Each structure stands twice: as structure tokens, then as C-alpha cells.
Curated annotation (Swiss-Prot):
Highest taxon, organism lineage: Bacteria
Keywords: ATP-binding, GTP-binding, Nucleotide-binding
TM ranges: none
Binding site for GTP: 81-84
InterPro entries referenced in this protein's UniProt entry, alphabetically: P-loop_NTPase (IPR027417), RapZ-like (IPR005337), RapZ-like_N (IPR053930), RapZ_C (IPR053931)
Gene3D superfamilies found in the cross-reference section: P-loop containing nucleotide triphosphate hydrolases (3.40.50.300)
Record-given protein name: Nucleotide-binding protein Arth_2083
């Protein structure tokens, strides 16, 4: 799918532009319970015009109307709920039509693991839309089967399993609050292997080869964000060389992502508990990657404070 670019705005004196103004179009979809409404609210807070629960067959018509308006909406987000085979066929057709007509757009797919989705539905005391009298898990399984092709083709897949409402809003802000699109957004995430691999990781770096500060009494209470721990980790034999070589190795991958219009990727750096080594290495890796042009780097620590 083509990379979205915000079009030029209408003249301030109210004159109609000579050529149509092209809006940045974002299609928001995903699993029920994964946070579409929260994402819509966050986008609206940052200047997006948001249309929720639009029937998929109306997507092309809305995009055409907006792009040809005398004073265009520069950032349009359409939240599409696909909960039946018929609606899924409609959105596939609508996206193909948009692509064929040259409309630039991106698709954001929100996902979460099954256990989290079940808990959210139970906490909200509401049934899954595809449950049909069965279990919530049955509805989730039906929806996953229905949406897997859409998920595979999405420009951005955002896993919200570890997010509360505020964390999801922050993630949406980091992705979409800037005036213009960024060629590639990297999230460097530290984590602890004992808590499981991050499901949205594109790359996994194993930092367990580094001596563990946990076994140094004066360092154990601290984290990889503290200078003493960071120095201990980064000064260990081979660590700085490893980070430098990893950055060089990943450079052609980042270039390929840009060519393929991939906008978001996660590099997960793991150690045993996600407290010392992975945190220090993630910070150093973020600093190195931030030097690359057309790359925006954010750093998160999934399991810091979990112990």
C-alpha cells in the first residue's frame, strides 16, 4: 500500500486550489477489543478527522469527496469494523479500488493476544460480536480466521496486549502525531525472556551473553538506566563491538523497509528479567540507530519494574 503523504492545504484567502488537495488517509481496523475506539480518540486529539464504523463500501466515496473538497481535511482516519464475511469482502474490494485509483493510504491493524481479548470482554461485560451464543474464545477464533489476510497486508500491526488505555494512546501519538509522515519508525524494546517474547517483535537481540549485573551486589537493586549498570554492561568484553556490528548488519534491512514502504518495526532486546542488560543495550542501540536519516526511534522497557 502506498505511503501516505499529507497534501498541500487550501489557500488561506479561501480560494479554491487549482488541483485537488490530497488528504492523508489512514484505515484503522483490527480485532474487536484490541482498542479501535481508543486509537480513534487519540487520533482525534492530534488533529485527525475521524469517521467511525464506516461501512467498507463507502470508503472510496468518502476518500474521493475529501480529496476533492475545496478545503481538504489533511488527515482523515476511517475506523472500519469488519465482523462478517460480507463486510470483509467489501473492505478488500474497497482497498483494492483505492490502490488502483492512486489514493495514498495506510492500514493500521490493532491486535492483542486471545487471553487479553477475553479479559477485556469479560471486564466490559459484553459479548464478542461473532460469539453467537458460544464462548468468547469462539468469537475471537472466528474473527481471527476472517481477518488474517487483512492483518498480513496491513502497513502497521500494533499489538496492544501490554497496553492500558493510556499506553495505547501514547503509542498512537508516537506513530501519528507529527505533521508529516516519517519514512520509518523504530521501537527498540527491552524485555525479559522469562516473561515471554514480545509478539510484535520484528527482530530479537539476545543480550544474555553479557555478564549479569544481578550477581554484583551493589548493582543488583539498580537498572540498566542507571549509569553504573550501563557502564558495567557496555564495558563488558565485546558488547560495544556487538552493538556496532548489529547496527551495520541491520542497515540494509532498514533501507529495504523504506523501499517497501514499511513504516514501523520493533527491535526487541532481551535478557533474563528485562532489568539490567537488555535495558542498557536497548538504550545504546537506540542512540546509534537515531543517527540514521529518515528514522525516528522510540525506546520502551516492557518488563522494567516487573520484578
Amino acid at each position: 500500500m502506498a505511503e501516505s503523504t499529507a497534501g498541500s492545504e487550501a489557500e488561506q484567502d479561501g480560494m479554491t486550489p487549482v488541483r485537488p488537495v490530497e488528504a492523508e488517509l489512514l484505515v484503522v481496523t483490527g480485532m474487536s477489543g484490541a482498542g479501535r475506539s481508543t486509537a480513534a480518540d487519540a487520533l482525534e486529539d492530534h488533529g485527525w478527522y475521524v469517521v467511525e464504523n464506516l461501512p467498507p463500501q463507502m470508503l472510496g466515496t468518502l476518500a474521493e469527496l475529501v480529496s476533492h473538497a475545496p478545503q481538504s481535511i489533511p488527515k482523515l482516519a476511517v475506523v472500519v469494523d469488519v465482523r462478517s464475511t460480507a463486510l470483509f469482502a467489501d473492505i478488500r474490494a474497497a482497498l483494492k479500488t483505492l490502490e488502483a485509483s492512486g489514493v495514498t493510504f495506510r492500514v493500521l491493524f490493532l491486535d492483542a493476544n486471545d487471553d487479553v481479548l477475553v479479559r477485556r470482554f469479560e471486564q466490559g461485560r459484553r459479548p464478542h460480536p461473532l460469539q453467537e451464543g458460544g464462548r468468547i474464545l469462539d468469537g475471537i477464533a472466528s474473527e481471527r480466521d476472517l481477518l488474517h489476510e487483512l492483518r498480513d497486508s496491513a502497513d502497521i500491526v500494533l499489538d496492544t496486549s501490554e497496553f492500558n488505555v493510556h499506553a495505547l494512546a501514547t503509542a498512537i501519538t508516537e506513530l501519528f502525531s507529527e505533521t508529516g509522515p516519517v519514512a520509518l519508525r523504530l521501537n527498540v524494546m527491552s524485555f525479559g525472556f522469562k516473561y515471554g517474547l514480545p509478539v510484535d517483535a520484528n527482530f530479537v537481540v539476545d543480550a544474555r551473553f553479557i555478564p549479569n549485573p544481578h550477581w554484583v551486589p551493589q548493582l543488583r537493586p539498580h537498572t540498566g538506566l542507571d549509569k553504573d549498570v550501563s557502564d558495567y554492561v557496555l564495558e563488558a568484553e565485546g558488547v560495544k563491538s556487538f552493538v556496532d556490528r548489529y547496527v551495520l548488519a541491520i542497515e540494509p534491512v532498514l533501507d529495504g523497509y523504506r523501499r517497501e514502504n514499511k513504516h514501523y518495526a520493533t527491535i526487541a532486546v532481551g535478557c533474563t528479567g528485562g532489568k539490567h542488560r537488555s535495558v542498557a543495550v536497548a538504550m545504546e542501540l537506540s542512540k546509534k540507530l537515531a543517527q540514521y536519516p529518515r528514522v525516528t526511534v522510540t525506546t520502551t522497557h516492557r518488563d522494567l519494574g516487573r520484578e
